[in-house]
């Protein structure tokens, strides 16, 4: 139900993002690659303090070194790669801080299999997790999504409704308000179709070396676009 509600509430914002992408060929405006501003050391320490346990995905707060594992009632997670990013990107009046990026191998508990079957038929899989903070620096309400699209070096592209965390980071943000949370996307997953086995095997041999995030456009309370979507590339 949460996924359905997210789709309904956020449809207008995605339409704006898609429209912006289609007009990119006509002019040099639209999506831009933004320059990051590094955070202070104190801000970096806040990344785990801001974390809120998720009802679908295994807690990864203790995973700081490649090879470390953690198990809970939602499954078993193994850390495959990690990048402390701690950079802030400005999208008009919105500040998006990417705090941390992880590549995690997850074997969900049996009780969670049905949830993940919407996205993959694999019993275990890798996913890229991005921990972000998003802040509205203006006094007026805006609508924005920190990740409307995500692309990897392997050629896969995901839109926002493939997010496995569902922490309601997309949508309205009141003036001066701030949200923190996770977004995660299953990568190199098998399709579940026999004729795609060769392609699935090839994808699994590819390492995730970088991701490219495209935010949504920023809209005001009347759903009028006030800032263009931005592209952010992050390497492991």
Curated annotation (Swiss-Prot):
Domain of life: Bacteria
Gene transcribed to yield this protein: ydhF
Keywords: Signal
Name the record gives this protein: Uncharacterized protein YdhF
Pfam families per the UniProt record, alphabetical: DUF4352, LPAM_1
Biased composition range(s): Basic and acidic residues: 24-35
Record's signal peptide: 1-23
Disulfide cross-links: none
Region Disordered, residue ranges: 22-62
Entry annotated with the keyword Aminoacyl-tRNA synthetase: no
Species name: Bacillus subtilis (strain 168)
InterPro entries: DUF4352, Membr_lipoprot_lipid_attach_CS
């Amino acid at each position: 139900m949460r996924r359905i509600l997210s789709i309904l509430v956020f449809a207008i914002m995605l339409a704006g993002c898609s429209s912006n992408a289609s007009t990119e060929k006509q002019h040099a405006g639209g999506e831009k690659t933004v320059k990051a501003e590094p955070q202070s050391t104190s801000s970096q320490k806040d990344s785990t303090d801001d974390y809120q346990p998720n009802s679908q995905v295994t807690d990864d707060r203790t995973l700081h070194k490649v090879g470390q594992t953690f198990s809970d009632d939602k499954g078993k997670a193994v850390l495959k790669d990690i990048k402390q990013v701690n950079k802030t990107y400005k999208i008009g009046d919105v500040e998006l801080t990417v705090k941390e990026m992880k590549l995690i191998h997850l074997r969900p508990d049996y009780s969670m299999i049905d949830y993940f079957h919407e996205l993959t038929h694999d019993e275990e899989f890798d996913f890229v997790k991005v921990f972000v903070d998003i802040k509205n620096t203006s006094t007026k309400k805006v609508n924005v999504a920190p990740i409307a699209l995500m692309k990897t070096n392997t050629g896969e592209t995901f839109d926002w409704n493939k997010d496995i965390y569902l922490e309601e980071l997309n949508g309205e943000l009141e003036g001066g308000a701030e949200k923190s949370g996770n977004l995660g996307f299953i990568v190199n997953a098998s399709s579940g179709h026999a004729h795609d086995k060769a392609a699935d095997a090839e994808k699994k041999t590819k390492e995730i070396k970088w991701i490219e995030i495209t935010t949504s456009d920023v809209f005001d309370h009347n759903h009028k676009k006030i800032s263009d979507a931005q592209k952010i590339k992050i390497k492991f």
